[in-house]
């Protein structure tokens, strides 16, 4: 039994893996700067996971990172990731909505382009070499990844976002599989509902008149 399996057994042994939605392994250092096959398999049992936090565990690559299709939130802060293999994230986590990669060693801002196939809504990239001393990086990240609404707790207007947890964010986004169910879409849905109700009432009225 590897240390990940031991940790999971000690903390979640009473639960089936499919019942767990959140796992936090912050400061839980990997032995070889990436996951092993055994560790990957251990975590892939958690098929309904929504939130995975792997902050400060010594990762230098995404090799053998577990593939969890349900994942909504991934935090990889304070590791040693360069971003050269960020193209793997789309395949591993196709539903990913929020990504934290601050405090890594990303020098090439272009590596963020590898995240474009994702429909990310929020990203945290501060404290990387490309962002230090660069007061225009937030705008550039918005330009590179057009689905984003928040970069480093800042929206496109330069306003600071209100703090929410990932549970609330997921509920807010239940109406849209892309995680972008906004007020305009909600208004459109309400209009459709009203139209359907009016049509239903008209049909009932016609039926009543015909029966008379």
Tell me the role of every PLM-derived stretch:
Residues 12-15, 38-44, 60-67, 81-91, ...:
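Recurring C-terminal helix/loop segment of individual leucine-rich repeat
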Residues 21-26, 47-54, 71-76, 97-101, ...:
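Conserved hydrophobic beta-strand positions in leucine-rich repeat
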Residues 1-53, 130-212:
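The feature captures the LRR N-terminal capping module
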Residues 17-19, 45-48, 65-71, 91-95, ...:
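Leucine-rich repeat
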Residues 89-129:
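Ankyrin-repeat and related helical/solenoid repeat scaffolds used for protein-protein interactions
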Residues 28-37, 58-60, 78-86, 96, ...:
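Canonical position 11/12 of the leucine-rich repeat
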Residues 1-5, 55, 82, 102-105:
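A conditional alpha-helix N-cap/helix-loop micro-motif detector
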């Amino acid at each position: 039994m590897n240390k990940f399996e031991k940790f999971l057994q000690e903390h979640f042994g009473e639960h089936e893996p499919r019942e767990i939605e959140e796992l936090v392994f912050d400061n839980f250092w990997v032995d070889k700067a990436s996951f092993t096959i055994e560790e990957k398999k251990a975590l892939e049992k958690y098929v309904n996971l929504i939130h995975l936090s792997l902050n400060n565990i010594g990762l230098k690559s995404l090799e053998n990172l577990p593939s969890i299709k349900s994942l909504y939130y991934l935090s990889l802060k304070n590791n040693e990731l360069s971003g050269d293999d960020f193209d793997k994230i789309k395949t591993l986590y196709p539903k990913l909505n929020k990504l934290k990669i601050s405090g890594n060693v990303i020098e090439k801002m272009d590596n963020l382009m590898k995240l474009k196939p994702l429909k990310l809504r929020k990203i945290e990239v501060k404290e990387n070499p490309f962002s230090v001393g660069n007061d225009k990086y937030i705008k550039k990240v918005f330009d590179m990844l057009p689905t984003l609404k928040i970069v480093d707790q800042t929206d496109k207007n330069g306003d600071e976002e209100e703090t929410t947890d990932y549970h609330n964010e997921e509920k807010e986004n239940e109406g849209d599989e892309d995680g972008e169910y906004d007020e305009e879409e909600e208004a459109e849905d309400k209009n459709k509902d009203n139209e359907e109700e009016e049509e239903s009432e008209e049909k009932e009225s016609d039926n009543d008149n015909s029966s008379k």
